[in-house]
Amino acid sequence: MAMNNWYECRVKFEKVLENGTQKKVTEVYLVDAMSFTEAENRIIEEMTPYISGEFEVTAVKKDRISEMFIDPDGDKWYRAKVMLITLDEKSGAEKKSASIMLIQAKDFQTAIKNLENGMKGTMSDWEINTLSETVIMDVYGVVARDSSEAEAKPAE
């Protein structure tokens, strides 16, 4: 399985609110790319059909997500810091290493359930250190380039 390189992209644009007024907003998206340049190009490509008028990519930063658990019914993204617990064979002491995971869910309880389901079969013990809702609006995974109608989907 290929390792994903996730980049958090901030996009600033004018959005029409529910009451009909326009307001400048900055939204956060996650993009799978090989470099900062590719991440910027990908977010421009993904956002162009959805934004009328001008928009600006104001920031691109690398995000160190090791796992992603997708729930098609979820409309929010949660970031979990999970501590993987291993035993040091020499000293016999417990060793904890942090891993950042992104979970799609409809609410906090579902995020915990989705994380637990995703971690089933994990060889080492683990515990949730933190779990919080993110401001990520959407995730754009790897795009299949061999089809003209290829769609970006979150990596599974």
Locate predicted features.
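Intrinsic disorder/low-complexity detector
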Residues: M1-Y7, Q22, E45, P49-I85, ...
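Residue-level signal for functionally critical sites in structured catalytic/ligand-binding pockets
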Residues: K12-V16, T26, E40, I44, ...
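A cross-kingdom feature marking solvent-exposed beta-strand/loop segments within repeated
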Residues: K15-D32, P49-S52, G92-M101, G121-I128
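Generic "edge-of-domain/loop-turn" microfeature
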Residues: V16-E18, F36-E38, E67, L87-E89, ...
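Short, solvent-exposed interaction modules
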Residues: V57-M123
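The feature marks the first
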Residues: M1-N41, L84
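A short, charged, amphipathic alpha-helix used as a generic interaction element across diverse proteins
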Residues: S35-I51, D107-T122
